[in-house]
């Protein structure tokens, strides 16, 4: 630049031809907003108890120039709502029903220009490269850059990442003390569903390169204008990125009782799990039937034994099921009389 042109930058008399743009200040505001609301409900009686909590949070970002167009707002945002509900029902004196439910909705929004690209361009673009907008209202740029950081925020559309989560389970427990003390039966059914979506409303913007026309003494005679790029209409695209569904059935008959220094815990358990995901070869199923017996004497010596008949659909037919036995012995040395009052070993 000549001394005269440097003076144009300094005095700011022609910001279209000799701009001095603080891109960071133009792109960011000094504050972000967060709104959060929490509700809790609990109560019940001896036979019925409930607890529900609802949380809503909305966090917005630091970007400027996000509402220049009525079709969308490109501000960074993170909106989340959680609903959790627990119910305990005493059906009879010996029958208890429990229901747990969690629903989570989450939506994250950003400008269509990737955040890493936007930040890089804000740092890479010199203040004198081009104006934010030219005198005709077009986005400023040059053939060297072919982009405009503020247009990347305001005029590229938005991308939303949407996540939906449902977790639910129900347990029914029946005490069977009328048969023998310590005997019980329990069954649990659970279902989980998680999905991720992408919602894109994007378009391209065009820019204008303005070049000054100077005389021999660097006086401004006028300028030339050249269009860069081609603007497009706002398009829409939605895609399911990920889908996962889990279901399980868990049932057991158990016996848990203590006789003096003897403690016995025995269970016969049936377990069935299934997982389904989008895509090929993504289904998994597993089935198990196993028995567990634990014996403890005086909180010092214990024996655990298990026999598990288990199978999975991942393996080939004819080789899916097998028997897996195991046994374990334990000794709680710290409960021995010769160590109970030992100050070093506890």
Predicted feature descriptions by range:
Residues 19-42, 127-142, 201-316:
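Outer-membrane beta-barrel transmembrane domain signature of Gram-negative proteins
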Residues 50-52, 97-99, 183-189, 264-268, ...:
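Transmembrane beta-strands of outer-membrane beta-barrel proteins
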Residues 46-47, 62, 94, 175-185, ...:
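Short loop/turn motifs that connect adjacent beta-strands in outer-membrane beta-barrel proteins
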Residues 37-45, 83-89, 168-174, 251-255, ...:
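Residues on the lipid-exposed face of transmembrane beta-strands in outer-membrane beta-barrel proteins
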Residues 3-14, 62-64, 75-77, 82-83, ...:
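Outer-membrane beta-barrel proteins, especially TonB-dependent receptors
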Residues 15-55, 59-63, 74-147, 157-164, ...:
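Flexible loop and strand-edge segments within Gram-negative outer membrane beta-barrel domains
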Residues 45, 56-60, 103-109, 167, ...:
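Transmembrane beta-strands of outer-membrane beta-barrel pores
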Residues 59-65, 108-112, 122, 194-202, ...:
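Outer-membrane beta-barrel proteins
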């Amino acid at each position: 630049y000549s001394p005269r042109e440097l003076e144009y930058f300094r005095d700011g008399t022609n910001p279209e031809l000799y701009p001095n743009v603080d891109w960071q200040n133009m792109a960011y505001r000094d504050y972000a907003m967060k709104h959060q609301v929490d509700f809790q409900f609990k109560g019940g009686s001896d036979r019925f108890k409930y607890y529900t909590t609802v949380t809503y949070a909305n966090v917005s970002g630091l970007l400027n120039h996000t509402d220049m167009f009525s079709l969308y707002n490109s501000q960074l945002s993170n909106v989340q709502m959680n609903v959790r509900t627990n119910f305990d029902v005493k059906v009879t004196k010996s029958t208890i029903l429990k229901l747990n439910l969690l629903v989570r909705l989450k939506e994250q929004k950003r400008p269509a220009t990737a955040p890493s690209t936007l930040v890089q361009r804000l740092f890479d673009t010199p203040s004198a490269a081009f104006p934010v907008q030219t005198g005709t209202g077009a986005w400023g740029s040059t053939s060297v850059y072919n982009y405009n950081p503020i247009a990347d925020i305001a005029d590229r559309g938005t991308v939303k990442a949407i996540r939906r989560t449902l977790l639910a389970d129900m347990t029914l427990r029946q005490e069977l003390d009328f048969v023998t003390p310590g005997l019980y039966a329990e069954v649990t059914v659970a279902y989980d569903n998680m999905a991720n979506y992408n919602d894109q409303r994007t378009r391209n913007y065009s820019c204008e390169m303005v070049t000054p026309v100077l005389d021999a003494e660097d006086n401004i005679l006028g300028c030339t204008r050249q269009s860069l790029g081609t603007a497009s209409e706002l398009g829409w695209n939605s895609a399911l990125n990920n889908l996962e569904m889990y279901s399980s059935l868990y049932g057991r008959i158990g016996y848990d009782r203590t006789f003096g220094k003897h403690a016995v815990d025995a269970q016969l358990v049936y377990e069935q799990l299934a997982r389904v995901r989008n895509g090929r070869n993504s289904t998994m199923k597993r089935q198990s039937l196993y028995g567990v017996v634990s014996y403890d004497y005086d909180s010092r010596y214990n024996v655990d034994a298990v026999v598990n008949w288990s199978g999975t659909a991942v393996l080939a037919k004819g080789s899916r099921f097998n028997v897996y036995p195991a046994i374990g012995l334990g000794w709680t040395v710290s409960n021995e009389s010769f160590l109970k009052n030992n100050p070093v070993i506890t």
